[in-house]
Amino acid sequence: MKPQLVNLLLLCCCCLGRHGVAGTWSWSHQREAAALRESLHRHRYLNSFPHENSTAFYGVNQFSYLFPEEFKALYLGSKYAWAPRYPAEGQRPIPNVSLPLRFDWRDKHVVNPVRNQEMCGGCWAFSVVSAIESARAIQGKSLDYLSVQQVIDCSFNNSGCLGGSPLCALRWLNETQLKLVADSQYPFKAVNGQCRHFPQSQAGVSVKDFSAYNFRGQEDEMARALLSFGPLVVIVDAMSWQDYLGGIIQHHCSSGEANHAVLITGFDRTGNTPYWMVRNSWGSSWGVEGYAHVKMGGNVCGIADSVAAVFV
């Protein structure tokens, strides 16, 4: 069967699956069909690279009904945050530990299941709060969901669901010593709200310190930071992640277009292509059960440019 016919059948099936067979298509349905058609063309290009070394593969997912500019506006809400090259004055030194072939903080039961930021550009808040949750659990305390909405509503110099900087959020949390409350007390709404204040006596988790690093060309040191300090907040270029289904991301992203904040929980160097295990905030149905695998070395997607470790 010709590829054009396959794409047409897929287009029809997907759209019928979303909108049913009754009635006529509205303008919004036609727009979604046009976006899906553009996605199919884009997938052909993204998958045109040789499929070797477990390279990533791309296809139809929950974002295929969005044009790239819509996807970027809705889901890529992180601002670039400059970090000094390691080592630099003021940075916490990294112990010179031996690197295992594979390590994942999930195996230590200190990483919560993947969350979903929905149509809120609050990735910067999700990554920071997830790092704090894990840092607390690494100390032997319970692994709880903390309030992302509290950071979205209250963080100074950030814009909530319209975007923000994870380093700016960490600096604000550290300087104010604000206590993050449980998600159940201040649940996620996926929209900006008015900041709710809690008494200082309120139980919660505060950020004692954080360190920001630029590990470009030093990803072994970055792996040591992960081992020594816990999951790391990073900012990446995730435009091509709109179409990601699995495999190891090695191409199709830039080290100069940071737009999305995520959390690195581990790495795997057992195969031909070593990779970072990257926890996203687009739900567990995206990627590899909510994770992306990004090649270690070469600063793929700018993953080593702005890296933060959190201490609670």
Curated annotation (Swiss-Prot):
UniProt-recorded Gene Ontology molecular function terms: cysteine-type peptidase activity
Catalytic activity: The recombinant human enzyme hydrolyzes synthetic endopeptidase substrates including Z-Phe-Arg-NHMec and Z-Arg-Arg-NHMec
Main location: other
Glycosylation sites: N53, N96
Pfam assignment, any one: Peptidase_C1
UniProt keyword annotations, A-Z: Disulfide bond, Glycoprotein, Hydrolase, Lysosome, Protease, Signal, Thiol protease, Zymogen
Signal peptide location: 1-23
Enzyme class label: hydrolase
Record GO cellular component, one term: lysosome
GO biological process: proteolysis
Compartments reported by the entry: Lysosome
Disulfide bonds: C120-C161, C154-C195, C253-C301
Active site residues according to the UniProt entry: C123, H260, N280
Keyword presence, Hydrolase: yes
Top-level taxonomic group: Eukaryota
Propeptide feature: residues: 24-98
Family per record: Belongs to the peptidase C1 family.
Job description of the protein: Proteolytic enzyme possibly involved in normal cellular protein degradation and turnover.
Full protein name: Cathepsin O
Organism field: Mus musculus
The gene coding this protein: Ctso
